[in-house]
Amino acid sequence: MKLCGFEAGLDKPFFLIAGPCVIESEQMALDTAGELKAITAELGIPFIYKSSFDKANRSSGKSFRGLGMEKGLEILATVKREIGVPVLTDIHEIDEIKPVAAVVDVLQTPAFLCRQTDFIRACAQSGKPVNIKKGQFLAPHDMKNVIDKARDAAREAGLPDDVFMACERGVSFGYNNLVSDMRSLAIMRETGAPVVFDATHSVQLPGGQGTSSGGQREFVPVLSRAAVATGVAGLFMETHPDPSKAMSDGPNAVPLSRMKELLAVLKELDTLVKRAGFLEDNFGWPACA
């Protein structure tokens, strides 16, 4: 898959989607994007900057949602222009697709909306690549139906049908908890779409703090190493200069100061795993009858 000027796939080095959960200010967006660009350029990792203009599914109605679409898109356009990186943001309603697609390079669909057929189809007909997040309630093999919906819609509109990614972000495990089943990453390859692992939302504790979500960022390195060892096309990570002051998802955000050391390890592991060239067919091992 061609994505933002680079090739994405299981036989290619992993790419990174990263940035703060929500846009807090233009200056922080510029500073964070600049730092991430420098880190990924040094390590040779393709990079897409991510941040949200609206967090439409906050635990509490009183929580900070963002700066709004108009201001948020203005800031993302500034990041794209001044820092020189592709940008991604999520949309939540069909009406948002057209104005957002006019600014960003990649669209992202929220996990909760992966079964909303009209929404997925509309995103697919935007003409932009789309990172489709798997719902916390969805079996990994069910993502094939979601990707197929997107591809059908793109073809109907006369658009490329190979611009969709399938993103794993954990699965509900009882109340206020998520777990990551690494088999999901291999199963989701059956969609034919590049598979992305969301290493930070996978350690989220949804609603775990009553009026906000908790998180266990100490497990981000553990799960990201496991995902890269399993084999992925891309990684998604939210990061913040000071997670304790983040306005959304601070408990599961990676401190910006720790990103370089983590990515360096993941880069080495990715190179080692993909060197063998056996990931796509699981080393040729047959499935049990």
Swiss-Prot record:
Lineage of source species: Bacteria, Pseudomonadati, Pseudomonadota, Betaproteobacteria, Burkholderiales
GO cellular component terms given for this protein: cytoplasm
Principal EC category: transferase
Protein name: 2-dehydro-3-deoxyphosphooctonate aldolase
Any Pfam family the entry gives: DAHP_synth_1
Pathway of action: Carbohydrate biosynthesis; 3-deoxy-D-manno-octulosonate biosynthesis; 3-deoxy-D-manno-octulosonate from D-ribulose 5-phosphate: step 2/3; Bacterial outer membrane biogenesis; lipopolysaccharide biosynthesis
GO BP: any one term: keto-3-deoxy-D-manno-octulosonic acid biosynthetic process
Key words of the record: Cytoplasm, Lipopolysaccharide biosynthesis, Transferase
Source species of the chain: Cupriavidus necator (strain ATCC 17699 / DSM 428 / KCTC 22496 / NCIMB 10442 / H16 / Stanier 337) (Ralstonia eutropha)
